[in-house]
């Protein structure tokens, strides 16, 4: 406990900038105290600035209606509502302003980018992805192959962890690229793997793929943006996309973003088109000609949701106020490092899966440079009877006692201390409560 206090003094966060759910608000009793919210990998907490930011746009709507598009009473006119966010978002992902657009939703943006960048020709048709890919991405890849008249099952090449391992090895990804070099049209992987929390070596993956100029490289950064430092331009990725409701704290279904490297600028790439991606000077002249913006903004299709932009604006201001991603990542390394330290000191922790009795291991890499904020815990023993299975019972116990992670069936709980709003004391208390939950189950496993 003393170490937690000392670490908090050394690494102060921005807790006061956020609303954190309480026991009472979650129906867990009448306590007004905040719970230990370790679920920012799924949905980030609401910044206190958000309500005012959104209400300002509601006020503009009520006061000026359509005229707020060009004559806003106190902020950015709606025709340009997303543009002030582009420089901030570019800093978040390590890109130039011309390489980033704030738009759409994650899978919609992924599909839009695949339309532009997945161009199968001759033998070069295959898409390299991971075996544990998030289902929405898998659906996008599968259907892109089908849209091109290809057999998706034969088109998708999936790289998996080795037998007995839980995370991908960079050398295995590189080897898969080399093996299929003559057939690959696209490599598309996560920046941070959603299930295990593994941070992939994106720089090495891009370098390996780009040894063959015909291979396009893209990333789904849903679990990376706002979590780890990114250098998309420097690494040379062709494209990337991300959401904003996890580590960016922009609210459920918040507006997303995409990156298109400057070498693809010029407006010549085929794409899903819409009027918001065309020349702003002539957009409202309703011409029946297509004059796309030359940079990432040319991938926009429709005008963005003003209320979603307002929520993202509030969140990005918190990041800026805190000092940017370098400081966020530094505090995150300390927080998750402390969580890892305490978990591995638990009497129920085992380095390997399958030990006797009740226990858990950590799927996430031990090396801090190979993970973000999230740690994924695998529990045992497993039972097909959900009332007897260890993980759901531990999860329910934790929630009842004010620790909120999330469950991934059948046996994994994900816990994420977020740098902006979680505290070292919360980490300490959460591990204490986890140990207590397992202690309550231990006598049963000994029967």
Curated annotation (Swiss-Prot):
Keywords: Cytoplasm, Hydrolase, Pyridine nucleotide biosynthesis, Pyridoxal phosphate. The modification N6-(pyridoxal phosphate)lysine is found at residue 246. Its cofactor is pyridoxal 5'-phosphate. The keyword Hydrolase applies. It catalyses: L-kynurenine + H2O = anthranilate + L-alanine + H(+); 3-hydroxy-L-kynurenine + H2O = 3-hydroxyanthranilate + L-alanine + H(+). Pyridoxal 5'-phosphate binds at residues 106-107, 134-137, 220, 223, 245, 275, 303. InterPro entries: Kynureninase (IPR010111), PyrdxlP-dep_Trfase (IPR015424), PyrdxlP-dep_Trfase_major (IPR015421), PyrdxlP-dep_Trfase_small (IPR015422). GO terms for biological process: 'de novo' NAD biosynthetic process from L-tryptophan; anthranilate metabolic process; L-kynurenine catabolic process; L-tryptophan catabolic process to kynurenine; quinolinate biosynthetic process. GO terms for molecular function: kynureninase activity; pyridoxal phosphate binding. Its EC number is 3.7.1.3. Its main location: cytoplasm. Pfam families: KYNU_C. One of its GO terms (cellular component) is cytoplasm. Pathway: Amino-acid degradation; L-kynurenine degradation; L-alanine and anthranilate from L-kynurenine: step 1/1; Cofactor biosynthesis; NAD(+) biosynthesis; quinolinate from L-kynurenine: step 2/3. It is found in: Cytoplasm. Homodimer. Catalyzes the cleavage of L-kynurenine (L-Kyn) and L-3-hydroxykynurenine (L-3OHKyn) into anthranilic acid (AA) and 3-hydroxyanthranilic acid (3-OHAA), respectively. Belongs to the kynureninase family. This is Kynureninase. It comes from Eremothecium gossypii (strain ATCC 10895 / CBS 109.51 / FGSC 9923 / NRRL Y-1056) (Yeast). The gene is BNA5.
């Amino acid at each position: 406990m003393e170490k937690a206090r000392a670490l908090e003094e050394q690494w102060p966060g921005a807790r006061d900038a956020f609303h954190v759910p309480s026991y009472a608000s979650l129906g867990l009793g009448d306590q007004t105290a905040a719970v230990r919210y370790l679920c920012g990998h799924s949905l980030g907490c609401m910044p206190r600035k958000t309500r005012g930011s959104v209400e300002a746009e509601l006020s503009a709507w009520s006061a000026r209606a359509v005229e707020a598009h060009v004559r806003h009473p106190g902020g950015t006119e709606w025709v340009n509502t997303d543009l002030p966010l582009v420089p901030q978002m570019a800093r978040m992902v390590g890109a130039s302003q011309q390489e980033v657009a704030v738009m759409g939703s994650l899978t919609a943006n992924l599909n839009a980018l695949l339309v532009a960048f997945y161009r199968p020709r001759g033998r070069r048709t295959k898409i390299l992805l991971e075996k544990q890919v998030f289902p929405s991405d898998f659906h996008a890849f599968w259907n892109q192959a089908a849209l091109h008249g290809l057999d998706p099952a034969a088109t998708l090449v999936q790289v998996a962890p080795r037998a007995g391992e839980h995370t991908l090895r960079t050398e295995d990804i590189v080897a898969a690229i080399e093996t299929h070099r003559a057939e690959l049209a696209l490599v598309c992987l996560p920046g941070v793997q959603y299930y295990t929390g593994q941070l992939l070596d994106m720089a090495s993956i891009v370098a390996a793929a780009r040894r063959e100029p015909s291979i396009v490289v893209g990333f789904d950064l849903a679990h990376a943006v706002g979590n780890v430092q990114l250098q998309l331009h420097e690494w040379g990725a062709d494209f990337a996309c991300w959401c904003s409701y996890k580590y960016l704290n922009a609210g459920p279904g918040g507006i997303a973003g995409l990156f298109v490297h400057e070498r693809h600028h010029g407006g010549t790439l085929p794409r899903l088109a819409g009027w918001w991606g065309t020349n702003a000077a002539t957009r409202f002249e309703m011409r029946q000609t297509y004059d796309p913006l030359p940079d990432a903004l040319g991938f926009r299709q429709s005008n963005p949701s003003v209320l979603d932009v307002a929520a993202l604006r509030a969140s990005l201001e918190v990041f800026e106020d805190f000092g940017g991603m370098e400081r966020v990542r530094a505090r995150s390394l300390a927080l998750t490092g402390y969580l890892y330290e305490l978990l591995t000191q638990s009497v129920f922790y085992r380095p390997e899966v399958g030990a006797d009795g009740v226990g858990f291991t950590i799927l996430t890499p031990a090396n801090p440079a190979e993970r973000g904020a999230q740690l994924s815990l695998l529990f045992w023993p497993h039972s097909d009877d959900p009332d007897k299975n260890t993980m759901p019972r531990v999860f329910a116990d934790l929630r009842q006692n004010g620790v909120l992670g999330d469950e991934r069936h059948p046996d994994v709980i994900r816990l994420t201390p977020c740098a902006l709003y979680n505290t070292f004391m919360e980490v300490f208390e959460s591990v204490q409560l986890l140990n207590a939950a397992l202690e309550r189950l231990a006598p049963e496993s000994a029967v």
